[in-house]
Amino acid sequence: MNRSATFFFVIFSYLFFGTEVSKAFYSDEAEVFCNDPVEIDSALRKDYRTAFLMVYNNLPDLHGCDIKLKGKKLKTTMAARPTFFSFFRKKGKRKYVIVYNNDPDFKGVKPYDVPENARVGLFAHELMHIRDYQGLNFGGLVKRGWQYLSKRGKKNLEHRIDSMTITAGFGEGLFYWSYFVLFNSGATAEYKMFKRNTYLTPKDILNRMDETGFAVYYQFD
């Protein structure tokens, strides 16, 4: 790959992230810790700060990672990514941003509309993205951007991240998050269809939880 093509992929990776990456793009380091603390935007409501820290405190491999939460206009409720220059840094020096949507005209699910039991699943999902990024070297991060170009690639990634969330013990929160988005939120039909086609559905989540021994019993209509 020539330099111009590599630079293009890096730019794209910063904006868009994609599907599961082959093991060849993972570093030999099984677990890497960052050096700097988490930073939460003071504008984020206290109850949301509490929900985030509850999840974060139960993920010791991410403790000390340089993670910042901030508000911004997005096309989704929340998104996690490395900062641009983190592509060129060692894992222990990377910085990550979790952006929550503060656009009052957003047609999807606004963060402050999310009920308490679903916030845990939302934050856990985003922190699993960071755990995933921490397992990738430069080539893996670049390939994330390339693979994000396809709907199938994005679906594979988000299913992977949802599965990681369940395995980490946050399946119940993820279930409540997914159920709220699809059945109880004020999001548009188009946005709900996007969510249904890209992420695990509530039934999918319950099935995965049952497989991993974290079942929550819920009767669907």
Features from the language model and the residues they span:
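N-terminal secretory signal peptides that target proteins for export/translocation
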Residues: 1-2
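Active-site scaffold of zinc-dependent metalloenzymes
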Residues: 79-117, 133
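Post-HEXXH active-site segment of zinc metalloproteases
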Residues: 132-159
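A metal-dependent hydrolase signature that marks the N-terminal structural subdomain at the beginning
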Residues: 14-87, 218-221
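Short alpha-helix carrying the canonical HExxH Zn2+-binding catalytic motif
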Residues: 115-131
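Catalytic Zn2+-binding segment of zinc metalloproteases
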Residues: 126-142, 167-173
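Sec-dependent N-terminal signal peptides
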Residues: 5-15
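Long, well-structured alpha-helical subdomains associated
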Residues: 154, 167, 171-221
